[in-house]
């Protein structure tokens, strides 16, 4: 038997603010459902946590340190068998500049 291969477009969203990334994912899903696309997601991916340790004093007191952290939140949206209208609507989506978007196509 010859199975029909699925064409999948993956949209990966990255941001430091989880509220902003959830709003953007909802906006993308609303636009794509209007085109009749088959969508999976938003799927939360692991959050990357970076910790930076800095000395508080410029000269002495090595025991006195300050720690900062930066969390990068990620969401995955999959579009299964997209049509031309779906791809065109993806090109015209406007999102905040704080959102990083990565598109991948798998077959």
Swiss-Prot record:
Pfam families from the UniProt entry: Ribosomal_S10 (PF00338)
GO cellular component, one term: ribosome
UniProt key word Ribosomal protein: yes
GO molecular function: structural constituent of ribosome; tRNA binding
Keyword Ribonucleoprotein: yes
InterPro entries: Ribosomal_uS10, Ribosomal_uS10_dom, Ribosomal_uS10_dom_sf
GO biological process: translation
Domain of life: Bacteria
Record keywords, A-Z: Ribonucleoprotein, Ribosomal protein
Function: Involved in the binding of tRNA to the ribosomes.
Record's subunit section: Part of the 30S ribosomal subunit.
Family as reported in the entry's similarity comment: Belongs to the universal ribosomal protein uS10 family.
Name of this protein: Small ribosomal subunit protein uS10
Organism: Onion yellows phytoplasma (strain OY-M)
